[in-house]
Amino acid sequence: MDELKNIIRDIPDFPKKGIVFKDITTLLADAKSFQRMVDLLAHRYVGEKIDKVVGVEARGFILGAALAYKLGAGVVLVRKPGKLPSETFSKTYQLEYGTDSLEIHTDAIRKGEKVLIADDVLATGGTMSAVVEMVRDLGGEIVECCFLAELDFLGGRKKLPDGKVFSLLTF
């Protein structure tokens, strides 16, 4: 995993002073690293009979679509308000500096479907806990929440359900 970890670059003071941003675009741009990441994550879920992979805006779309392709599943997008064209279900959640909202199509997940939720980085867990609630409210059965990377020191894993969390890399 070190070869994947080492290709991710740190961007100091982004998006604001005092934050060290983990920039995964370097990994995405390297074909062999991107393939390895997708293969390693997909291998974990082979045999799980995943029906849908939920990708969280925006980098989660990349990971979610690639995993869905490998697993023979459909892709569901969770987006910021006003970006999805049909009827949506919305969830507002707390941030350390206010609130934010996400939306999903109301017909994107059927009751009992097995769902894998994918995003690039697990930080505080606020966004992902909202997505988990949305999927459950639509009747989806969550197999796991998977991430390319986890910022362990922020404790986001504690906000997520039943230990159903997997991160390929931990910082």
UniProtKB/Swiss-Prot annotation:
- Function, as annotated: Catalyzes a salvage reaction resulting in the formation of AMP, that is energically less costly than de novo synthesis.
Family, according to the entry, reads as follows: Belongs to the purine/pyrimidine phosphoribosyltransferase family.
| Molecular function terms from GO | adenine binding; adenine phosphoribosyltransferase activity; AMP binding
GO CC annotations on file: cytoplasm
Pathway per its UniProt entry is:
Purine metabolism; AMP biosynthesis via salvage pathway; AMP from adenine: step 1/1
What HAMAP family has UniProt attached to this entry? Aden_phosphoribosyltr (MF_00004)
Task: Please name the GO terms of the biological process aspect recorded for this protein, alphabetically.
Answer: adenine salvage; AMP salvage; purine ribonucleoside salvage
Protein name, entry field: Adenine phosphoribosyltransferase
Which is one Pfam family of this protein? Pribosyltran
Cite the EC number: 2.4.2.7
Q: Does the keyword Lyase apply?
A: no
Keywords from UniProt, A to Z, are:
Cytoplasm, Glycosyltransferase, Purine salvage, Transferase
Task: Quote the catalytic activity from the record.
Answer: AMP + diphosphate = 5-phospho-alpha-D-ribose 1-diphosphate + adenine
Q: Which Gene3D superfamilies match?
A: 3.40.50.2020
The record describes its quaternary structure and partners as: Homodimer.
Matching PANTHER family, A to Z? ADENINE PHOSPHORIBOSYLTRANSFERASE (PTHR32315:SF3)
Where found, per UniProt?
A: Cytoplasm
Q: Which gene encodes it?
A: apt
